[in-house]
Every structure is written in C-alpha cells, then in structure tokens.
From Swiss-Prot:
The lineage of its organism: Bacteria, Pseudomonadati, Pseudomonadota, Alphaproteobacteria, Hyphomicrobiales. Pathway: Cofactor biosynthesis; adenosylcobalamin biosynthesis. Belongs to the CobB/CobQ family. CobQ subfamily. InterPro entries: Class_I_gatase-like, CobQ/CobB/MinD/ParA_Nub-bd_dom, CobQ_GATase1, CobQ_N, CobQ_synth, GATase_3, P-loop_NTPase. It comes from Brucella suis (strain ATCC 23445 / NCTC 10510). Gene3D superfamilies: 3.40.50.880, P-loop containing nucleotide triphosphate hydrolases. The gene is cobQ. PROSITE patterns: GATASE_COBBQ. This is Cobyric acid synthase. Keywords: Cobalamin biosynthesis, Glutamine amidotransferase.
Length: 483
C-alpha cells in the first residue's frame, strides 16, 4: 500500500480541494509519483474521468496537478444532489441509483469495500497518495459507518491533518472544538493542523497557533496566506457562487441565473478569466441585468425542477425581454433542454412532473430517458469551424426543427441547436469555452475582442503558483514525513 496523508476540514469550503491540488503539484515537482483520492464526494460539479466514468471535478483537477490521467477510482463514491432529500449515487464512476437520507446512512458500510478497492488501485505504483476528506469529522451524528473522514482514515490507517479556514472567523474555536468533540479513537489519528486563507501579517497569529497547540496537543504545519492563484482555478462548491459580487463594468456582461441545482458551473471559468468579460451570477430574487449581452442557462442536476424555479423567479419573462432587446442566449445541457418548447418525463426519472412547457426559445423538444450519456468528446463548432474538446453528462434525447442548425459536430452526429437568427444557442457539451480559438471567435461575434489567453496553460500556471505558495508557507518536509 502506498504511503498516504489525509486532509480533513473543520467544515465545508475550508479549502481542502485546492490545498490537496496544490500539494499534489508540490509532490510532483519534488519528483514523487503522487495521486489524489477522495473516498466520498457530494457535488453536482462532476467531470468525466479519462477512463470514462463520473468523478468530482476537484479530483479531475487534482489529477491534472499530479500530471496523471484521471480515474473513477480517485473518487469512488460521488453523490449528486437532485432533490432536498435525495442524491444520485455514483459508485466507481457508474450510476447505482438514488440515495436518500437515512437509507444512505445504512448503505455506507457496504460502500467501504468499493472505497478500499479504489484506494488500493490508486495507490498501486504511487509513492504518495493525498486523500481529501468531506465536510467535517466533527459531524458525529454521521460517524456510524463513515467512509468519508475518520471511518476511512482508521480503516486504511492513514494519518490526518486538520485544515481550518481563518477567513471565515473562529478558526481557533473550530479546531479546538473539533478536538473536543472527536472520540478518542478518531482524535488519535490527527497528527497536526494547518491554517488556510490568512490575510495580512501572519506573525500576528503566532499566539493563535500556540493556543491551538496548547489546547489540543497538535503541532502546526503552518499558515497558508490568501493566494491569488486560487481564484484562477476551477471551483467545485457552489457556495463560491453565492459570494460573487459585481466588479467594474466590462465590455460584455454575461448573466447566469443561479439555479438551485446548478451543475458544472466551471463551464464559466474561461469566460471569467477574459479581461473584457464580466460574469454576473444572479441569485434568486434578483433580476437579470438589463445590460447583459449574453445570458447563459447552465447545467443542472434536475432540469424540470430548476425550470420551475426559473419561472418562480420571473427569469422566464426577463429572458424573453432580453431576447427582444437583441441579447443572446446559450443553454448548456439542462439549460439547453429548458430552451425548447416542451420537456417530457413519462417515466418520472426527475420526479412527479411528467410533462412541462419549456421556454419556447428554440423549436425543440426533450424526452427524458433512463440511459445516461457520460463521455469525453472531441467536436467541431459549426458556428465558427473551430475544434472543441468537452464532455457530456446528461439524460434525455432532444429533437426538433432547430436541430437542423446544430451547434457542433461530434464524430458522425450533430449536437445542439441554433435559432434561425443565430442568437439562441443550445448544446449538450460541457467545457466548450475552454477551447481558446472557439472562445475568441464566440466573443468576437458578440462584439468583444477576446484576450489571447490559453486557458489550459493558465490553469497549469495557477497550479505552479499555488505550489510555490505552499512550499513557502508550510512545513512540507514535516507533512510528507507523516506518510
């Protein structure tokens, strides 16, 4: 079994995913064969792994940081929330059904075998495996049968480092409180802690570090400052969208309704990186900005439920007004399905609504079907005759007159639809804006001169900068010696 270290957090969104990605790049730069692993993830921001299954987008990024192909075994259990009470369950990349609250808690012990099998496969041939926990180990109400945090750490005998987020405040209480709450067996797995997202003079927190060590007996592995490189990396948790605020006005405003079950929102990251583009995330209760040149309807884990939510917010009427003003619309995956005249779900795959009128902006209809399409694809944009690389993760089959004007060509078949005037577009492809030449042509058609940024190179550069920041701020030798 490969050497391993596990990073658990005092809560969600403390920066574990990015931290592990950065440490993966640190280890790679030091010449180690390093691999990422996350036993259980809950996210609608999924990726298609290089071996053809679904994993969390964070593990895809971590594999990139390691310089290795991504694998379903890097995230053997993925939960994709689709209602307030239930999630789609993905095991080793494949759909295994729906998991609801208490039923999933009873199911978790059975999933440990799959988790350990995947952990062994990931570790085969590796020098080091960097493991990411989920949420917080202090959620002791979920401890029985745990596969995400201490349950896994004990079962696999992997030492744990706790990560605290000082930016949100209360980091001393979070770490000391976690120490207090953890059962003795779990507490014994913790070898130390580190502080993430510090702003200002780090020396001002010296007394804080000493206090945490005094209360817990845990050693400090350092304090990570607020690193600008993080903002240039894909985010996995939608909580980051909730904190988005408008900046200085740019040449093109791209408005994105924040649907309750928004998925694969990292489709927008290449647009956010363009200097002439401002991506505005529009929260429920707010109006679509009247100065938007483009509205993007993003992917969603539940198309019908989010279409109902879109109407409840009045965004359907605002979208029609946007089009009448001459604005453009792009629907991606579930957003593409919403743009049509009708969505039918006779088998109740998404819930109790079996048939619903769409937005009517494209002359298409969608029929929900049980078979799920999960694949990486190479395509050609038929709008700009430029190559595309992306992926599909969806259920449903779409047809109709506007499909005669497809968005892209994938092998021997067409994808998506475009309205007769070219201003309404839809596609099942995720990741289209990562294609630099397509993105530049797309923006130019909207009257904006795109930058010359190579998006993939910018992500690689951000990972390198992140690794440099971690090398400078953490006791890397001490951390890696834990394994």
């Amino acid at each position: 079994m490969a050497r391993a270290i596990m990073f658990q957090g005092t809560g969600s969104d403390v920066g574990k995913s990015v931290l592990v990605a950065g440490l993966c790049r640190v280890a790679r730069n030091r010449g180690l064969k390093v691999r990422p692993f996350k036993p259980q993830n809950m996210s609608n921001n999924a990726a298609v792994s290089d071996d053809g299954g679904e994993i969390g987008r964070a593990q895809w990024l971590q594999a990139l940081a390691c310089g290795v192909p991504s694998s379903v075994h890097m995230n053997p259990v993925l939960l994709k929330p689709q209602t307030d009470m239930g999630s789609q369950l993905i095991v080793q990349g494949q759909v295994r059904g729906e998991a609801r609250g208490r039923y999933y808690q009873e199911l978790k012990p059975q999933l440990m075998a799959a988790v350990m099998e995947s952990f062994a496969k990931v570790g085969d041939g590796a020098d080091l495996v960097l493991v990411e926990g989920a949420g917080s180990p202090a959620e002791i109400n979920l401890r029985a049968g745990d596969i995400a945090n201490m349950g896994f750490a004990i079962h696999a005998d992997v030492p744990v480092v706790l990560v605290g987020d000082i930016d949100r405040g209360g980091v001393i209480a979070s770490l000391v409180g976690t120490h207090t709450i953890l059962p003795q067996e779990d507490r014994a797995m913790v070898r130390g802690f580190l502080i993430n997202k510090f702003r200002g003079d780090i020396s001002l927190f010296d007394d804080g570090l000493a206090a945490i060590t005094r209360f817990t007996g845990w050693r400090s592995f350092g304090v990570v400052p607020w690193l600008k490189a993080v903002s240039r990396l894909p985010a996995e948790d939608s909580v980051v969208l909730e904190r988005a605020v408008r900046g200085d006005k740019k040449a093109l405003i791209v408005a994105v309704p924040m649907l309750p079950r928004i998925a694969n929102f990292d489709d927008l990251d290449p647009l956010k990186a363009e200097p002439a583009v401002e991506v505005v995330m529009v929260p429920p209760g707010s109006s679509l900005p009247a100065d938007a040149g483009l509205v993007v309807l993003p992917g969603t884990k539940s198309t019908i439920a989010d279409l109902l939510a879109l109407r409840e917010n009045g965004w359907d009427r605002e979208l029609v007004a946007h089009v009448k003003r001459g604005g453009h619309v792009l629907g991606i995956c579930g957003g593409f399905q919403m743009l049509g005249r009708r969505i039918s779900d006779p088998a109740g795959i998404e819930g109790n609504v079996r048939d619903i009128e769409g937005l009517g902006l494209l002359d298409i209809e969608t029929m929900m079907e049980p078979e799920k399409v999960v694949r990486n694809v190479e395509a050609v944009s038929l709008l700009h005759d430029e190559p595309l690389e992306g992926y599909e993760i969806h259920i449903g089959r779409t047809s109709g007159p506007d499909m005669a004007r497809p968005f892209a060509r994938i092998g021997d078949h067409d994808d998506g639809a475009v309205s007769p005037d070219g201003r309404i577009m839809g596609t099942y492809l995720h990741g289209v804006f990562s294609a630099d030449r397509f993105r530049h042509h797309f923006l130019r058609a909207l009257g904006v001169e795109g930058g010359q940024m190579n998006y993939r190179e910018s992500v690689e550069e951000a990972l390198d900068e992140l690794a440099e920041g971690l090398e400078a701020s953490l006791d890397i030798d001490g951390l890696f010696a834990l394994a």
